[in-house]
Amino acid sequence: TDVRSLVEVNLLSVMALVDGALPALRKRGGGQLAIVSSLAAYYGLPATPTYCATKAGLKAYGTSLRGWLRSEHIRVSVILPGYVSSPMCAAMPGPKPFLWQPERAARRIRRGLALDRARISFPFPLNLGIWGLSLLPACLAMPIARMFGYDR
């Protein structure tokens, strides 16, 4: 099914790749892992529930790995981009506020990795808005999401 394939591609394949990379990272005495999630990890958008669920799973996985692997000198950063111009983004339903070009996103990610940030999220206004929605009770968050066009 589409649900199963999305979970396999977005979540399970990343977990398998990390699992496969860990022996080499341990052997060399450390390294860095960058796990790409999404700002959609913070608040489940009605139009893309499976996508949001997989990205929330990656966020939790990466955050857990960071603490687990720290003593082995393996750094882990979770990348939480908003909308980045791409064919995949263009095909997604709903508005795409604060759309970034890939080059700008790459610069932000590179800087965050160099600083060993736990989370690299952008753009700030969308990050703040989505994070804020996640703190509200559903009876308030859902009408706000609908107001911005995220109702399907």
Which residues does each predicted region cover?
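Active-site-adjacent segment of SDR/Rossmann-fold oxidoreductases
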Residues: 43, 64-75
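Active-site helix of classical SDR
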Residues: 18, 54
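Substrate-binding pocket helix/loop in short-chain dehydrogenase/reductase
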Residues: 1-5
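C-terminal helical subdomain
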Residues: 78, 94-129
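Active-site loop immediately N-terminal to the catalytic Tyr-X3-Lys motif
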Residues: 45-49
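Short, flexible catalytic-loop segment of classical short-chain dehydrogenase/reductase
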Residues: 81-91, 95
